[in-house]
Amino acid sequence: MSKTILIADDEPEIIELLKLFLERESYRIIEAYDGEQAWNYIRQHPVDLAIIDIMMPALDGFQLIKRLTNEYKLPVIILSAKNRDSDKILGLGLGADDFISKPFNPLEAVARIQAQLRRAFEFNEPEEKAISTQSTTVGRLTLLHTACVVYRGDETYSVTPLEYRLLNTFMQCSRTSIFTKQQLFEQAWSETYWEDDNTIMVQISRLRDKIEDQPRQPVYIKTVRGLGYKFASKDDFDEEKT
């Protein structure tokens, strides 16, 4: 079935350019020219992926992304001329999955869109994600493999598909492994690493907010200076009990 992609941008020529290339791939395109129009459509109709400009009237892209990620689980790609590191970090921190800077190569944009759709929908196909157990537990943390859910003691947190893949990578190899940023990126994003450390740092920060009692003093995801990250082992918590 053809996937539905919403493009929210106040520049009609940008929408038309993306629409031209995406319709060649048989995607259904919904056009929105401000944030409120995009939000109202998504509230009433199913959308598989949203492409959002930052600078829009009525409701800007950052506000729209915050609303979307609080209420919906769909891939979000920022498409913007605001390409400072601070803009990228803010957008990814609010829940966006990718950031494409204007001007852009439409073929590269299509490839990134397809990658996000592939990840989002492959995650929901159990035959392609065979997992031997229903959950993995380390300390007070339990990752449920049948849904995007993590339990921290008695508290329940929803995680995005990307956060699930990142946390699962850590938890499946939590004994002694130190992951470089390149290894984490290629495992969780399934793409070749392009030395974008900000993307990884933002996602690690978001995960820590959900799984750590004190995110600034992490127990589970530990930074190994100069090397990368290490996840707590089950032995660490067994020792606490003795």
Curated annotation (Swiss-Prot):
Keywords: DNA-binding, Phosphoprotein, Transcription, Transcription regulation, Two-component regulatory system. The modification 4-aspartylphosphate is found at D53. It comes from the Bacteria. Residues 133-233 bind DNA. Phosphorylated by GtcS. GO terms for molecular function: phosphorelay response regulator activity; transcription cis-regulatory region binding. GO terms for cellular component: cytosol; protein-DNA complex. Residues 4-117 form the Response regulatory domain. One of its GO terms (biological process) is regulation of DNA-templated transcription. Coiled coil: none annotated. It holds the Pfam family Response_reg. Member of the two-component regulatory system GtcS/GtcR which may act in the control of the transcription of the grs operon which encodes the multienzymes involved in the biosynthesis of the peptide antibiotic gramicidin S. This is Response regulator GtcR.
